[in-house]
Amino acid sequence: MPKYKDISKVLVIGSGPIIIGQAAEFDYSGTQACKSLKEEGVQVVLVNNNPATIMTDTDIADIVYIENPTVEVVEKIIAKERPDGILATLGGQTGLNLAVKLKEAGILDKYNVKLLGTSVESIKTAEDRELFKRKMQEIGEPVAESVTVTNVEDALKFAKNYGYPLIIRPAYTLGGTGGGIAHNDEELISIVDLGLKKSMVGEVLVEKSLYGWKEIEFEVMRDAADNCITICSMENFDPVGVHTGDSIVVAPAQTLSDYEYQMLRSASIKIIRALKIEGGCNIQFALDPQSHKYYVIEVNPRVSRSSALASKATGYPIAKIAAKIAIGLRLDEIKNPVTGKTTAFFEPALDYVVTKIPRWPFDKFYTTDRRIGTQMKATGEVMAIERSFEASLLKAVRSLEIKAYGLRLDSVRGMGTKEILEDISVPNDMRLFYIAEALRRNIDIDYINDVTKIDKWFLNKLSNIVNMEKEIEENELSKEILKKAKRMGFSDREIATIKGIKEEDVRTLRKKYGIYPSYKMVDTCAAEFESITQYIYSTYCEEDEVETHDIPKVIVIGSGPIRIGQGIEFDYCSVKALWALKETGIKSIIINNNPETVSTDFDTGDRLYFEPITLEDVLNIYEKEKPLGVMVMFGGQTAINLTEELVKNEVKILGTSFKSIDISEDREKFSKLLKELNINQPKGGYALTVEDAKDIALKLGFPLLVRPSYVIGGQSMEKVNTLQELIDYVKHATEVSPGKPVLIDKYIDGREVEVDAVSDGECVLIPGIMEHIERTGVHSGDSFSIYPARNLTEREINTIIEYTEKISKALNVKGLINIQFAVKEGTVYVLEVNPRASRTVPIMSKATGVPMVKLAVEVALGKKLKELGYKGGLWPQTPYTVVKAPVFSMEKLTDVEVSLSPEMKSTGEIMGIDLSYEGALYKALEGAGLKIPKKGKILLSIAERDFQEAVSLVEKLQSLGYEIYATYRTGKYFSLMGIHANIMSLDHAIKLLKNGYFDAVVNTPTKGKKPDNAGFKLRRTAVEYRIPLFTSIDTIKAALNAVSKVNVNGLSVLSMNEYQEIQKDNVKNLVL
């Protein structure tokens, strides 16, 4: 049937900020859905409070609201825009939960808005654990023994009858939030108690553990006419018990017999039909390795992380098709955009193997528990495509950017066998490398299978890789051996390491033997039909299917997997760069390996190479394509770190030169430049050893700010207050960046200010100046930032402009540059310069309307800003305010210090925008989970150094009518100052916190970092029980200011289109 006649305007709910469990895959699917609806002539209204995604650009949806997706706000948008339908199944758990609330509040009926795609009844049946269990039993599909509980006592009764281990899964949550595996009563009580608080409906499922069974997933599509197809089967390398988001996943499933495959495929189709899901759906099964017995684990009645992986693995655009199904189209009426010939009612066929490996944040949080289980901890993932499992796995490993180019890691090889065997027995982020090492030490495959429950098929494949390592080690690098190694997926660098030679020697030998990669197309149909899209992967010793043409083209290097410090902001920049190249008539080529992102969609660039971002892989593509040059400024530190080696291999870098990048990244060279330019910088020095560091500390005094070179997200950056802290730090930092100097600066206790600019080497355009709410010493990615800056004098603003121009010209920047300043007592200091796209480019582009990435691309290609219609200097500031708030995923990462510091910890961000400053700040606080009520109970536990400053805070709290509670030392100090507070012990405060007694906690850390520290426990409890936590007095003061002055009903709900119209009037006099 054709699309619904009465649907001409659709409201799409976006997924909000990037958090563990709900990352960029929803931005990718949401973006694809918006484009898909517009293709059908539907007007699209979007609600999403994430400024970092391309989805919230006005190019994607027709009308964009960067507002918090709450029932109250969305009702206002519905009343204003009057959409005919609402699409919620592409916004992750945020979208689903909101759709259910809107329906239950009667808002959809009140405004006659049709819920498109899957109905609320179907969502509830899939998401509510008890309803789901009943539905499966009704259709004869097996589910594990389980009980839905709303209290701890019922969970303990179930445990008494069925024994341990048990798996706990809360209803209506994502990424396994609040779930876990309990092995005894104590663990069960703890997990269920927390899970009940995390569940939107106060329910958890307690089920008999199927730990050790195979976990198999099917991605299925269904339309309103009951047509169904399976898109892809996927197999988890790790058995049941590890969250699929934390598991290595292979597509198609590798170890199923044809009987097992058909059995689970039939069950998948039966389930999607019974649930009446319209669109995409992910079904997870547990399969007994010893029989054909299986259980249905769960169903996601929406596009999910696995859907994004299945889309990229097959080339079948699930979200695009799901959006068309939602407005009434049938699968056989929708064209497959990859082949251009077949319809979407066509099951994809794969003639290659896809491997996904999660990217965990443990390089940032080396104190956290590295074990993985039912609660997800990965921030992102990589995907690789090859012709065999071995080659696909090795390609994925080197895409992770964890300094692993194969399965041999020095840190693992130095471990004792007993330790290796212990680490194999528990799932953790390094288990793949431990298993490889066990195989090297001739540990029996049966034993490893028995301990890990990983299928022997996978273990035999790992054994093949280990045997190949041995063959390389023991023989001359003949043509045959090199060919065999390359075909198995070994990188030049790994072969060089095994042989103890240089990577370039292997590359030279490989070329001498005539061993080059061949490139293949992803076409959804195993080459049965010709592909019209350019979605490419490499392999060895096969026919090359990819033709190159002698036309102007440019390679954009992507940013790889999402991790803390390098999020989707960089994917936003890569996508904008590809579009800008297309506009100039130059063919755009992207190299990236992240299956969650828009940049790796089959039609974003003219050509997509789904490959690791390593020197070898980039050089191979460069030599094949022969482009005008390569752009590294949009791919974050991933691309920047490759620049030196690319230049050595005569690759032309478009934009700022490597020499300039090196000056800004090398702290010593950069300091010298600032001195020459007569620009203020914090006093400091450079240390290569602990002794150097001690000498500098003696000269400068404490506190000090210490950081290594060439890192992102402030990795390993700390504020140190004592000599011992400094010694411990330098020892660790030299491991992160060996041979690179450690920068030691005198800490400046001032306001932090940030600028993004576009430079053509002569003219410098500054779209705006952002001011941080928190003082220096908090990483810029973790600060609340305000645009336009509110507390700078005219003289300070002029100095910031002058310094930005001086530095941009001295470095001959051709493109984007980001500069961070500290301002103290009227003096402006330069803290850091990044001559590339920064994480604030998307939010500043949206706030000001300046197309920063487009200008940077044009400038890199040789144009001048004046030719493009822009003058230098500071762009007129907006008459509205934008506030960027960080969003953290700390509840998923146990034993991690949550207080703000120089090292970045946030996984995402949200934006508050309003005609008033207080309104924008209020929205930002609410979106970041830091909304405090106008009255309530506030707990304070303050470090001694902050006592004085806390007095004015407490006076403000009391004047606003809050009840003050304080821990002993804090309360005692307040008493001395004549301030009344209810005083209690920390242990009692933590107990009350768990029971939801307090409305907010203010805790500035003393020592921090140590899990046995009482303050650490207080902060962790606040995070785990979702109580607003403030670890900076600056943030809570700003929050009180917003809460006390804002009339919530008076907040403006304007679209970005309306804000941009307001700003256009502002700039008329500046544009040439």
UniProtKB/Swiss-Prot annotation:
Every ATP-grasp domain range: 133-327, 671-861
A Pfam family this chain is assigned to: CPSase_L_D2
Catalytic activity: hydrogencarbonate + L-glutamine + 2 ATP + H2O = carbamoyl phosphate + L-glutamate + 2 ADP + phosphate + 2 H(+)
Binding-site positions, Mn(2+) 4: 832, 834
Carbamoyl phosphate synthetic domain as annotated region, ranges: 545-929
Positions of the UniProt region annotated as Allosteric domain: 930-1072
MGS-like domain mapped to chain residues: 930-1072
Residues given in the record as ATP 1 binding sites: 129, 169, 175-176, 208, 210, 215, 241-243, 284, 298
GO biological process terms on file: 'de novo' UMP biosynthetic process; glutamine metabolic process; L-arginine biosynthetic process
Cofactors required: Mg(2+); Mn(2+)
GO cellular component: cytoplasm
Family designation: Belongs to the CarB family.
Annotated function: Large subunit of the glutamine-dependent carbamoyl phosphate synthetase (CPSase). CPSase catalyzes the formation of carbamoyl phosphate from the ammonia moiety of glutamine, carbonate, and phosphate donated by ATP, constituting the first step of 2 biosynthetic pathways, one leading to arginine and/or urea and the other to pyrimidine nucleotides.
Subunit structure as annotated in this protein's UniProt entry: Composed of two chains; the small (or glutamine) chain promotes the hydrolysis of glutamine to ammonia, which is used by the large (or ammonia) chain to synthesize carbamoyl phosphate. Tetramer of heterodimers (alpha,beta)4.
Domain notes: The large subunit is composed of 2 ATP-grasp domains that are involved in binding the 2 ATP molecules needed for carbamoyl phosphate synthesis. The N-terminal ATP-grasp domain (referred to as the carboxyphosphate synthetic component) catalyzes the ATP-dependent phosphorylation of hydrogencarbonate to carboxyphosphate and the subsequent nucleophilic attack by ammonia to form a carbamate intermediate.
Annotated protein name in UniProt: Carbamoyl phosphate synthase large chain
Upper taxonomic lineage: Bacteria, Bacillati, Bacillota, Clostridia, Thermoanaerobacterales
